[in-house]
UniProtKB/Swiss-Prot annotation:
It comes from Dictyostelium discoideum (Social amoeba). It catalyses: L-seryl-[protein] + ATP = O-phospho-L-seryl-[protein] + ADP + H(+); L-threonyl-[protein] + ATP = O-phospho-L-threonyl-[protein] + ADP + H(+). GO terms for cellular component: cytoplasm; nucleus. Residues 1-21, 60-100, 131-151, 236-256, 375-504 are annotated as: Disordered. Pfam families: Pkinase (PF00069). This is Probable serine/threonine-protein kinase DDB_G0283337. Keywords: ATP-binding, Kinase, Nucleotide-binding, Serine/threonine-protein kinase, Transferase. The lineage of its organism: Eukaryota, Amoebozoa, Evosea, Eumycetozoa, Dictyostelia. Belongs to the protein kinase superfamily. Ser/Thr protein kinase family. GO terms for biological process: mitotic DNA damage checkpoint signaling. Residues 777-1054 form the Protein kinase domain. SMART domains: S_TKc. The active site is at D904 (proton acceptor). ATP binds at I783, G784, E785, G786, G787, F788, S789, T790, V791, K809.
């Protein structure tokens, strides 16, 4: 979903969240001038239903009576209480119950109801139905009234018969209390939905709130409604496609089970009335004018239909038998793939929570069989309402929910502690003082002064808010139950009526548990509260907008010292791993908690350092933007530890470099860290040089150019047990009688032809490979090991009894990807032929897995150069064969104009064999080699090879080419030339102290650095190395030109050996960052710019490089590096 919020969000306005049924939205819409339809922004689909009753939105009370207890003798109704007195007495029921029953069960609607509207209907029923609403309506609101034009009462039996009792089973709490309005705000329509050409029984509950402007209460323009549509029903045969454009609602049907969905709809006009005769449009949803909130296509925007379909599928399976939970889990996995585009959406989270809760329910019942987790404690005390005294002592507070009220939001678990409000049950004959009714029967005046202001408890199950008032909080849903008793008899007690209410509530709760949605969500909340501490700071910041909303509406949370708001930010720095770091810091900076320290004097940086995902970016943003007091952050904590010490202990070198570059004192590391002198010196060396190029790696801070090592991730994902299993399967012993048959036909089976992505020519090459029997190999011993394979040496006896020393390359993994790589390597290696290409003898199935048998050499070229002195004669022998071997690979198919690229050229992959003093160089390891065919286009665009040897264009996503291999050959020849001049072997870029790390590789990619070529080389040889390592592929010579140039250098040397020997005589190694390095880059820059003037780059894909080259000041860069080196 798109988020159109700016970083600088006004505190007074609620941000524009993208559309989701569970998110709070405060929107105002234009009134409809002429149409009787009600315009509600629901989605980009339109839904229609027909009315069953005539509903007026002007009288907003919903009163339908189960029990006809109204006495119509001169009733004086005061303050919305139908106090019926048979003796013509005035019953003043001053019920100051703000928030009487708005927060129950899964509700999160906040109703600060202050204005009560009159209800004049004779047949009422009070529904206290609270769903998983997500609206946050702090409005001066009252009840919703369904005006029944007839005088007939709706009997309970009739409603149950017509609606299969799904009212009681689907909603949270129903209090059937006579003549007592609980500020309910729900309209109910019992309809039938036409869904995918089938009919579904449903109940539609329209939740309405009125928001009035206190300054102008008479102006209807300031009144708005907030609607919630709740659909209950099931369709066992529903199809997956739920994108129907119309859902028609009819009147008559029965429902079969409980499936529900809810959609919040905002803001209709107060004066619009739904007419009974208008059968087309009670509710019509149209596209919202604010298009920014609906940037989704039609298939994704039909949230309601998708949610209906998913719930139907899920509960069709999991509600049949609890033992079939495995089917529910399969559905869960299926939903993950089907709803991948809704990963952060309400639908995805809710459905998975319900599925998981169903499993947890069974597990919990098995572990705690005696737990009353599914009992509704809020009604445990209903039967305590029996009071047989002659006075009207109404023990209302025993009906309160005194056990627990826990609400779960997507961001927080909020808990209300049970305190001592349950001690309000006083059985004195005349006075009930603790929040009870003071009833005096002597004068027949029942003054029910219920001062049970439930202002101390507001619990939200909102996506954005979780609030708790810290007073002795008990939700008094039943505070007014006994007020009904004052409406019936003057001298008789109302205990019977109270008992009736208790029975009704008890019956309701028995049925309510049958609803799978409410039950699952309630169970999930109950199970989670046993594991999560009662702390408001837990997971508060799932969305940075929540911080602003909570701060605006409940600022006391951020000012109360008890809550310690800075802990919220410290917890954020420690654990947050998502995006929008800058927006979060913007919101926290407005609150003013970023610079706060905890009780141990640890600043926010202490916690950000431990964040393995966003730690570097958090520290960089806070320090660079001045959000934190650096001078305070530099100080040590109570334990004498500094931030730099913590970086060392956590081995977080990148943050350590960053902090030192901003002026943190690095000498305290020596004083406080238990490191050896050499360790500290190495750290300083790394820090000083990193400061020189720190300005070149802002992209690495944001993680844009850091490449993930997929192989490493895969290895980490696999558990050790699975790896052992793979090895066990791969190395399973083969019976002797069939081993020869398996070896003989291992490459003749048909499965590898279809199972792996092999081409026709590759299959033909594989079939030509010889199969070597295990008995022909002996004398195994390991000689080397790499990241993907292990090399053994052995003795091979062929059919002519000729003994040949061989090398055996076996692989560490034998999954499908590994087998495909093995087959491709065998295919390429078998097809290549040349005097400088290592010979492939065959393959064999050995105890350590499928292995490749190759010709054995003495050692690789890296070890040879390290162990031997190099002179000019040996230099030309080795260099000539090195470039010849690459030429034999590149030009293997000249007639077909197909080149094979090695893609992993380095000294380790050249092998050398010495016979009678004659050195022969072979190129090997063709695991990454591919041809430049069209089918290999994607493969050649991937980054493959060894870091520090890969050509710069490969990092930028360009196709691999023969010129990319030339760059790698140039790096290897540089290492050979360095040993020639200075007498020691070095790694590429050693003079810059660049290790094989992502941050350092970023420098090579962005600056065009190449290894410093020894200045004592003859100019012709020096220029060849410059060209081979050029950043521009077009500037590099072809492999044929390299062979010719080396041959000319050799001829020049042979014509004047004395001159060359004098120039190439062993010199002392130059110090780092010397003038030669600066002069070299001036030469590179001028040389490349000359090339640009002679070459048309309009059609060249590397023109971006030219702009980078012209804008980059090499001299200032290296002068800066040099100054840091001299300071040392």
């Amino acid at each position: 979903m798109e988020n159109n919020n700016n970083n600088n969000i006004n505190k007074t306005n609620t941000p524009n969240n993208s559309f989701s049924p569970i998110k709070n939205r405060i929107e105002h819409f234009e009134r409809m001038s002429s149409s009787p339809n009600i315009s509600i922004p629901l989605s980009q689909k339109e839904y229609y239903c027909s009315p069953k009753k005539n509903i007026s939105l002007n009288n907003i009370n919903h009163n339908i009576n189960y029990n006809n207890n109204n006495n119509n003798n001169n009733n004086n109704n005061n303050n919305n209480n139908n106090n019926n007195n048979n003796n013509n007495n005035n019953n003043n029921n001053n019920n100051n119950n703000n928030n009487n029953n708005c927060i129950v069960g899964e509700s999160n609607i906040i109703n600060n109801n202050k204005d009560d509207y009159n209800s004049n209907n004779n047949s009422t029923i009070n529904y206290n139905i609270v769903r998983e609403s997500n609206s946050n309506n702090n409005s001066n609101n009252s009840n919703i009234n369904i005006n029944n034009n007839s005088n007939n009462n709706f009997e309970k039996e009739k409603i149950i018969e017509n609606n299969k009792e799904y009212i009681n089973s689907d909603f949270d709490s129903i209090s059937n209390n006579d003549n007592n309005n609980y500020n309910n705000n729900n309209i109910f329509i019992f309809e039938k939905i036409e869904y995918n050409k089938e009919e579904i029984d449903c109940v539609i509950a329209i939740n309405s709130d009125i928001e009035s402007n206190k300054n102008d209460e008479n102006d209807d323009n300031y009144k708005n409604h907030n609607y919630e549509i709740i659909i209950v029903g099931e369709n066992n045969n529903s199809k997956e496609d739920c994108n129907s454009s119309n859902n028609s609602y009819d009147n008559d049907s029965n429902s079969n089970s409980d499936i529900s969905t809810s959609v919040n709809c905002n803001s209709i006009n107060n004066n619009d009335t739904i007419d009974k005769n208008n059968s087309t449009n009670i509710i019509k949803s149209i596209e919202n004018n604010n298009k920014n909130n609906y940037n989704k296509n039609n298939n994704k925007n039909n949230i309601k239909s998708i949610f209906e379909n998913i719930l139907i599928k899920v509960f069709t399976i999991i509600d049949k038998e609890s033992s079939k939970l495995i089917q529910g889990l399969k559905i869960e996995n299926k939903l993950k793939s089907q709803l991948s585009y809704l990963e952060e959406d309400y639908i995805y989270q809710t459905v998975l929570a319900i599925l998981q809760t169903k499993v947890l329910q069974v597990i919990f019942n098995d572990v705690f069989p005696n737990s009353n987790i599914y009992n509704d404690n809020e009604n445990n005390n209903n039967n305590n309402n029996n009071n047989n005294n002659n006075n009207n002592n109404n023990n209302n507070n025993n009906n309160n929910i005194n056990n627990y009220i826990v609400e779960e939001s997507n961001n927080n678990i909020s808990v209300i502690d049970n305190n001592n409000n349950s001690d309000n049950n006083n059985n004195n004959n005349n006075n009930n003082n603790n929040n009870n009714n003071n009833n005096n029967n002597n004068n027949n005046n029942n003054n029910n002064n219920n001062n049970n202001k439930s202002n101390n408890y507001i619990v939200e199950e909102s996506n954005n808010n979780s609030v708790i008032d810290n007073n002795n909080s008990v939700i008094d849903n039943n505070n007014n139950i006994n007020n009904n008793s004052n409406n019936n008899n003057n001298n008789n007690n109302n205990n019977n009526n109270n008992n009736n209410n208790s029975e009704q509530n008890f019956t309701y709760n028995e049925k309510k548990i049958q609803n799978p949605i409410i039950r699952c969500i309630r169970n999930l909340r109950e199970i989670r509260i046993k594991k999560i501490p009662k702390n408001i700071h837990v997971d508060l910041f799932q969305d940075y907008r929540n911080i602003q909303i909570i701060h605006n509406q409940f600022p006391e949370l951020f000012t109360d010292s008890i809550n310690d708001c800075y802990k919220i930010f410290h917890h954020f720095c420690l654990t947050y791993s998502g995006p929008d770091v800058k927006q979060f810091l913007c919101e926290f900076s407005k609150i003013g908690v970023i610079s706060c320290s905890d009780e141990n004097e640890n600043s926010s940086l202490y916690y950000a350092i431990e964040n393995k995902v966003n730690g570097l970016q958090l520290v960089c943003e806070m320090v660079c933007n001045g959000l934190i007091n650096i001078e305070m952050a530099k100080k040590t904590n109570k334990h004498g530890h500094s931030i730099l010490c913590k970086c060392i202990n956590l081995k977080n070198i990148p943050i350590l470099k960053l902090l030192i570059s901003f002026g943190f004192d690095h000498f305290e590391i020596c004083q406080n860290c238990k490191n050896t002198d050499q360790d500290i010196q190495d750290i300083f060396d790394d820090i000083y040089f990193s400061m020189a190029y720190f300005s070149t790696i802002p992209d690495s801070v944001n993680g844009k150019l850091i490449k993930t090592n997929i192989a490493l991730l895969t290895e980490l994902i696999y558990s050790q047990e699975k790896l052992k299993l793979l090895f066990k399967v791969a190395n399973a012993p083969v019976p002797t009688e069939i081993e020869k048959a398996v070896n003989k036909f291992i490459f003749k089976m048909d499965d590898y032809k279809t199972k792996y992505n092999l081409k026709k020519n590759e299959i033909e090459s594989i079939e030509k490979v010889g199969i070597i029997d295990k008995s022909q190999l002996s004398d195994f011993s390991i000689i080397g090991e790499g990241g993907f394979s292990t090399v053994h040496k052995a003795t091979y006896i062929n059919l002519q009894n000729t003994i040949t020393p061989v090398a055996i390359k076996s692989f560490k993994n034998y999954d499908d990807d590994s087998f495909e790589r093995i087959y491709k390597e065998v295919s390429v290696h078998q097809s290549l032929q040349g005097e400088n290409i290592l010979k492939l003898i065959g393959v064999s199935k050995l105890k350590f897995g499928l292995s490749i048998i190759i010709e054995k050499c003495d050692m690789d070229l890296k070890n040879f150069i390290s162990c031997n002195q190099i002179n000019l004669d040996l230099f030309f022998i080795l260099s000539t064969q090195m470039v010849n071997s690459v030429s034999q690979v590149h030009n293997h198919y000249p007639e077909a104009e197909i080149n094979v690229y090695h893609r992993d050229i380095k000294l380790e992959n050249w092998l050398i064999k010495t016979i009678d003093g004659n050195h022969t160089v072979f190129i090997s390891d063709f695991g990454l080699s591919r041809s430049n065919t069209e089918s290999n286009g994607c493969t050649l665009q991937q980054i493959r090879g060894t870091n520090l040897h890969i050509a710069p264009e490969c990092y930028k996503g360009f196709l691999f080419s023969s010129q990319s291999d030339i760059f790698s050959v140039g790096i290897s020849l540089y290492q050979l030339a360095y040993k020639l001049v200075y007498g020691k072997f070095v790694h590429p870029y050693h003079e810059y102290q660049i290790a094989d790390e992502p941050e350092n590789l970023n420098i090579i990619q962005n600056t065009g650095l190449i290894p410093t070529i020894p200045p004592n080389l003859p100019s012709r040889l020096k220029r060849l190395l410059f060209l081979m390592m050029s950043k521009m592929p077009e500037r590099r010579p072809s492999i044929k030109e390299c062979i010719e140039e080396i041959q000319k250098c050799k001829e020049e040397y042979e014509s004047d050996r004395t001159k060359w020997d004098t120039e190439i005589s062993v010199h002392e190694d130059y110090s780092l960052l010397n003038e030669q390095m600066i002069n070299q880059y001036h030469y590179i820059k001028s040389d490349v710019l000359d090339y640009i003037r002679d070459f048309d780059l309009n059609q060249n894909p590397h023109d971006n490089y030219v702009q980078e080259l012209e804008s980059f000041d090499y001299s200032s860069y290296f002068i800066k590096c040099k100054s840091f080196n001299e300071d040392r």
